[in-house]
Amino acid sequence: MTNRENPTPLKFLSYIIGLSMILLITLFISTLIGDAKIQASTIIEAIFNYNPSNQQQNIINEIRIPRNIAAVIVGMALAVSGAIIQGVTRNGLADPALIGLNSGASFALALTYAVLPNTSFLILMFAGFLGAILGGAIVLMIGRSRRDGFNPMRIILAGGAVSAMLTALSQGIALAFRLNQTVTFWTAGGVSGTTWSHLKWAIPLIGIALFIILTISKQLTILNLGESLAKGLGQNVTMIRGICLIIAMILAGIAVAIAGQVAFVGLMVPHIARFLIGTDYAKILPLTALLGGILVLVADVIARYLGEAPVGAIISFIGVPYFLYLVKKGGRSI
């Protein structure tokens, strides 16, 4: 067994501390970036001695900090959701966007906006969760067989077809109810419109979901080693798989409600975490969360430099080649 497959606690701790420092530094730098020129000293004053009458401090507290926090939690949610799905299905090509969770959530959000145009963000998050269940359930039912379980390529093909169908339905709703701008935002992906009213619901719900999945990370690790082995060790495979998939759908649904369809975060980041730390999900999940938060935050900073380009497009620029690389490898199980 290699050191990477059996890392020391000190090595894991060093990764956590190092990535946390990178995340904090990136948060500070990203708060400096925007149309309004703001000094570093102004950020410190806004955090520790907030003055509501100061316009620059208002920009920091009401626009930039919520946007930065949204980028981090969206990245964490999508990355961990992808890690869970890859672990449950043993499919290295799995991603919330590629198996229909994101398009299902977007469809449910478009439908909710059409029926309840002035609804609260809490209702939107719940709708996103239900939509993610719809999209994911259809794809996983098509992609699973009694003979070979979750076949990687069958899941991806089913995901592409279901995502196309749900996206078409979302666009049809947008045309019928004049929601073109809203649906375009969800399709492109971004966190520019996030406010504290969004975060007050999203942060605790994502936090609870992450806590639950961490408490059953050992069971997820065993399940990832094989269904037969998990059953042999006395694990309730159906229950563990169900809980894990529900958590993944909650995380994806909330992320889409905040930022729209941001693909490939859940595909790339878990692979990086496994490369660094091995196959123990008790270590993979915290690393995945930090890496995902950093990735989306950096992508949002780049998007600002490019004149508010879609975050989803920035990440896809990296994600599509990586996805094609994995397909070329044969979409092997993990």
Give names to the regions the model predicted:
Residues 1-334:
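Alpha-helical transmembrane segments in inner-membrane proteins
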